[in-house]
């Protein structure tokens, strides 16, 4: 792995913080907005954006790159996975690109993790791929964004397994039970399975949260699966936010039925398009979604160090 230090730049500094104050958070969010307008996509995930305002979170650090005191770049590092290397996302202000700031942030992340690092490149742009190569990172994971039209929604009415009923989420009442089912359903997927009450509260506080689009499947009064939908109002885009089924309830068509229920809900909201994210190596899920009319829209790439 060749990761020569970036050339020094006059006035450039990288500051590492465990939490951001309100002014720093606003500056970072403004930078992210400018980058999203320029790039056509977010450089930092929803979870990462929630952490910017969320104060101190165990295992999370923020890297602010400034030039003559002005914010020019940002990175977030999460070190909560007991097995995998710390994961990072980074972005440079569109007006500050081409000056080695991305490489400087990458070098700071490598130094902070002892050169044991994973980095997301949302959208997999050529610039992001080049930076990964410069930092000595190798492609590790491919996350696909799939989309399909909801006009018309040419899906049959969902058929639930025998004994299963569906209702909508009740905030407060269902929190603990849903978190337990989410942990069990995503025991193999720490990014989703490790969600806490604080993570759930953060999402419930977001303007997009609507319990009418959060469906719970029950058998004998116990939650056995769910489909949480999300509406991106500005883009008029519906999302299959997360679908989960308890391991013991899998294999009977519940996941497909829940997905269909959510898509019918999004179509009833007069949304023209639905989207979802799925790992490319989850071939079974990719096949199911493709049979439901989804096709690949774009790809997020994760790179990691060899060590």
Curated annotation (Swiss-Prot):
GO terms for molecular function: mycothiol synthase activity. 1D-myo-inositol 2-(L-cysteinylamino)-2-deoxy-alpha-D-glucopyranoside binds at residues 46, 191, 230, 239, 277. Acetyl-CoA 1 binds at residues 90-92. SUPFAM superfamilies: Acyl-CoA N-acyltransferases (Nat) (SSF55729). Monomer. Belongs to the acetyltransferase family. MshD subfamily. The keyword Plastid does not apply. InterPro entries: Acyl_CoA_acyltransferase (IPR016181), Bact_Acetyltransf (IPR050832), GNAT_dom (IPR000182), Mycothiol_AcTrfase (IPR017813). Catalyzes the transfer of acetyl from acetyl-CoA to desacetylmycothiol (Cys-GlcN-Ins) to form mycothiol. Keywords: Acyltransferase, Repeat, Transferase. It comes from Streptomyces griseus subsp. griseus (strain JCM 4626 / CBS 651.72 / NBRC 13350 / KCC S-0626 / ISP 5235). NCBIfam families: mycothiol_MshD (TIGR03448). The keyword Repeat applies. It is an enzyme of class 2 (transferase). This is Mycothiol acetyltransferase. It catalyses: 1D-myo-inositol 2-(L-cysteinylamino)-2-deoxy-alpha-D-glucopyranoside + acetyl-CoA = mycothiol + CoA + H(+). Its EC number is 2.3.1.189. Residues 15-158, 164-307 form the N-acetyltransferase domain. It comes from the Bacteria. Acetyl-CoA 2 binds at residues 243-245, 250-256. One of its GO terms (biological process) is mycothiol biosynthetic process.
């Amino acid at each position: 792995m060749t990761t020569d230090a970036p050339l020094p730049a006059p006035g450039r500094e990288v500051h590492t913080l465990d939490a951001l104050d309100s002014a720093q958070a606003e500056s970072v969010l403004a930078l992210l907005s400018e980058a999203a307008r320029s790039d056509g996509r977010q450089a930092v995930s929803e979870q990462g954006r929630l952490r910017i305002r969320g104060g101190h979170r165990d295992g999370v650090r923020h890297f602010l790159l400034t030039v003559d005191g002005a914010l020019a770049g940002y990175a977030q590092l999460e070190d909560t996975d007991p097995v995998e290397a710390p994961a990072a996302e980074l972005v440079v202000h569109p007006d500050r690109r081409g000056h080695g700031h991305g490489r400087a942030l990458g070098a700071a992340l490598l130094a902070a993790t002892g050169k044991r690092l994973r980095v997301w490149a949302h959208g997999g742009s050529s610039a992001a791929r080049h930076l990964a190569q410069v930092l000595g990172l190798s492609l590790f994971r491919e996350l696909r964004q799939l989309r399909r039209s909801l006009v018309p929604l040419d899906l049959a009415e969902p058929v639930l397994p025998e004994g299963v009923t569906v209702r909508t989420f009740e905030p407060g009442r269902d929190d603990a039970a849903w978190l337990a089912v989410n942990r069990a359903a995503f025991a193999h997927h720490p990014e989703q399975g490790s969600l806490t009450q604080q993570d759930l509260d953060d999402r419930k506080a977001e303007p997009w949260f609507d319990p009418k689009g959060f469906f719970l499947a029950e058998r004998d009064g116990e939650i056995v699966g769910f489909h949480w939908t999300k509406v991106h109002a500005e883009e008029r885009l519906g999302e299959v936010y997360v679908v989960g089924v308890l391991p013991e309830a899998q294999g009977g068509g519940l996941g497909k039925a829940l997905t269909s229920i959510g898509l019918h809900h999004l179509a009833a909201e007069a949304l023209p398009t639905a989207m979802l994210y799925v790992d490319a190596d989850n071939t079974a899920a990719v096949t199911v979604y493709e049979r439901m009319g989804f096709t690949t829209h774009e790809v997020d790439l994760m790179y990691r160090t060899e060590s």
